[in-house]
Amino acid sequence: MNETFTTKQSRRVFFAKSTKTAIGLSLLSSSFPLGSEAANNLYGNIKSIPTMNGTISTKDFGVTLIHEHLLFGDIPKDKEKVSVDFAVAMVKEAERVGINTIVDLSPTRDIRLYQEIASQVSLNIIVSTGSYIYRMMPDSITKLSEEQYKDRLREELTKGINGTTIRAGIIKVAGNKTPLTDWERMVFRAAAKVHQELNVPIATHAIFNPEEQFNWLVKNGADPTKLFFSHTEAKFGWGGLTREQMGEQLLRIAKGGGHMMFNNFGYAFDTPWEDLVYLIRLLCDNGFRNKVLTSSDCYWHWNNGKMIVNVDDVHPETRQKTYAYMITDAVPDLLKAGFSAKDIQAFLVDNPARFFA
């Protein structure tokens, strides 16, 4: 692990001096000042959102990574300290490049470890409730009835998580099949019902057929403008569709009010760069820039005593992708691809705040 931190420290020195980071920071400095009157007017309804360290106003979100993971999966007891230290280092790197808010979409996280992380950093951390894909969920989640599942959502959204006063600010559900399985339909339906009651947004894991997820949530009463669908650009989930056909599906979701979250920056093995640019550009050119969200989707987990960062066991280069990557690499690459500073501000500042408001 010492080698890991040495590598990361070297990267942070490089980032501090790099032209890419300078471009990203220059862009972010042009955003609305946090709490400004301009921000108030832009975001319309202002809400207070719970974070790990108290509530914040949506107008104070600033630069937001809307789909991340501080920790992922079960953390072995003897790996807790190194896991927390690793997460803290990555969050502090994000702070240095101008990121203000991280939305964590690990809905069955160990809140105790998250408290340790939050106590050592200054940016806002919004946590989630809900569930991930079935095979990765414990029996304590998969064996819940629909009413019990809804009760869990309500408790973590209104009272606190695992006996703490820390509340979730968003619901996360996941589909890993198309069509959705009976269990997936149940948790999506439960999420839609609690969302209706509490006016809390929903994020989904949507590699396969996001339109089916969108239609099912809306059928069960969800406000389409408070839904976002993650990983829709992952080509292996397109089911044989061309990028043009997939683009048409995303346009239909956007026309219905839904948002898309793109994260495969630097993941050409899942989404060729030209396809990623095509899909984001298609939404923007058709008047749906306000429906585009971007994030890094970084995570790390333990496998047989080894820390796997992103998918570096198969693609070693992905170890270099951290929260900061969105600013140091993805933003400059988007600018080179022809997106404007206003586009980037929409993806990272305006749209996340409006989505939660």
Descriptions of predicted regions:
Residues 116-119, 125-201, 252, 259, ...:
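Active-site gating/metal-coordination segments in enzymes
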Residues 67, 102, 195, 260, ...:
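Divalent metal-coordination and catalytic microenvironments
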Residues 1-13:
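N-terminal secretory signal peptides
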Residues 263-264, 288-312:
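Short acidic/histidine-rich active-site segments
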Residues 61-66, 71-124, 147-167:
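Alpha-helical scaffold segments that flank or form the walls of functional sites
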Residues 30-58:
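C-terminal segment of N-terminal export signals and the immediately downstream linker at the start
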Residues 197-275, 312-324, 333-337:
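Active-site core of metal-dependent hydrolases
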Residues 10-28:
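N-terminal export leaders
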